[in-house]
Amino acid sequence: MRFWFVLLALLGKEIYAYENERNALNATAANKVCGLSTYLKGIAHRVNSESAVVTEKLSDLKMRSIQLQLSVMRNRVPSGEQDCKDIRTLLKTVLRNEFTFQQELEEMRNASALAAAAAGLAAGRLEEWIFVFAQAAGRSSQFCISVGKTGPAEYNNLQECFDGTIGPETLYKIEDSRVKESAKTSLQLHEVLSSISFGSLGVKNIRGGNGKDGCNLVRTDTDGVLEGGSPTRHNLTWGGGVMNFGSYQNGSMYVEGGEYGDATEYGAVRWTEDPSKVSIFKDVIRLFARFQEAKNAVVKKIKTTVDELTKCIGQKEAELTNDQLYEEFIWETINRLELSKRVSEQSAFGEEEETIVKFNYTAEPVRGPFTVAGANAAAIHLSVSTAALCRSALLLGVL
């Protein structure tokens, strides 16, 4: 942003043209560009929201795993399911998968951070462009964004760009409701990008003004922003490659569709035909696709594992709330561990008959005064940790 303020300062007294045939950017195109900028900022909210859904699915998997273990301890695994015959192997696989899924979840979060960062950078480039053009306005014949009249566009003509009087403080921020709402739209990235293409906008919505608008920011001739223009060095681009100018463009802005590399002729003006080829959008497309791929992969794996678990869970265990499940599981585990200890001690004295009886125990355990509903946050956290430790112990030989 500092660069553009310096540019404006340097061009301040000569930023407007002194000859005719100087057109401005149409406010319609400016608003479309700002709409894209808002959508790109919203990608941060979008990836955070989608990541939270995956985290919730992983938590659900852990609960299904506990339900299954409780069903096993109470001999309530559906006997008719062929896939439930080798429960021990299934549980080990689930625990191993949980660890793998947690790693994949972290990789997905890293991908989401990169996608959000790339989108934020692209959004910044776009809004800096429109901000500079909106600020470059003086008398009725000197402005760089036009609304089809003899005067510059005001903030009410650029409501997709500014939330009030034109200025850096009124650009939409990432925490604004407008940006958050954009994250909820069903529009996909490629659809929003295509909305600013030359084919979507057309010349009439890009080239504004009446030919006497005096905008020097669309000139690359010797009197424009690139003084002493050279046909090999002094091409100009705005928006990171959205609007491109060849050397010696006098401001007439006879725009055609094309990319930065196509603006090679004298006086050429090319507005992107394919935004996916614009450099600032390439990283957004690539990194957002990587995030989506990582998200979809881990969601699919979690769903497959949950489906395998669900068909082996007893009906009563499936009906428990999460709080009830933790309480039941903890007390059942404590009871089983105590029982295993007693059996081990008795076995040392040859009490084989009692050992058999104990190992076939299926009664509900006697519970103490503990209830999750009445516990404080620290106790709940401790119970979750205890449950995780007990699950490992069960798989090591208690079951």
UniProtKB/Swiss-Prot annotation:
Propiece span(s): 377-399
Keyword Membrane found: yes
PTM comment: N-glycosylated. Glycosylation is dispensable for heterodimer formation and host transferrin binding.
Keywords annotated in UniProt: Cell membrane, Disulfide bond, Glycoprotein, GPI-anchor, Lipoprotein, Membrane, Receptor, Signal
SUPFAM superfamilies from the UniProt entry: Variant surface glycoprotein (N-terminal domain)
Membrane topology qualifier: Lipid-anchor; GPI-anchor
Domain of life per record: Eukaryota
Residue positions the entry lists as glycosylated: N26, N110, N235, N250, N360
Leader sequence residues: 1-17
Location(s), subcellular: Cell membrane; Flagellar pocket
Subunit structure: Heterodimer composed of ESAG6 and ESAG7.
Name of the featured protein: Transferrin receptor subunit ESAG6
Gene symbol of the encoding locus: ESAG6
